Amino acid sequence: MKNRELTNKEVIEIQLNYPHGTRIVLNHMEDKWAVPPGTRGTVEHVDDAGQIHPKWDNGRTLAIVPQVDSFRELTEQEL
């Protein structure tokens, strides 16, 4: 998927859907130094561009670009 600038409405929606403390798991990341698929993390914040900044369980801090990368929130059973 092509990276495009998000609207303010889209950024606010991401911020509301992924507040600080949300647990996520990465499916795929489009980056030369990508975090490995299956890595879990905790959302620290969503920036003004709509990028999600998790603290990955493996110690990495690379941001997710929602319109390019694939991830999901962990279910209650997975926590």
Predicted regions and their residues:
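Basic/aromatic-rich interaction segments and small domains that mediate binding to polyanionic partners
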Residues: K2-L79
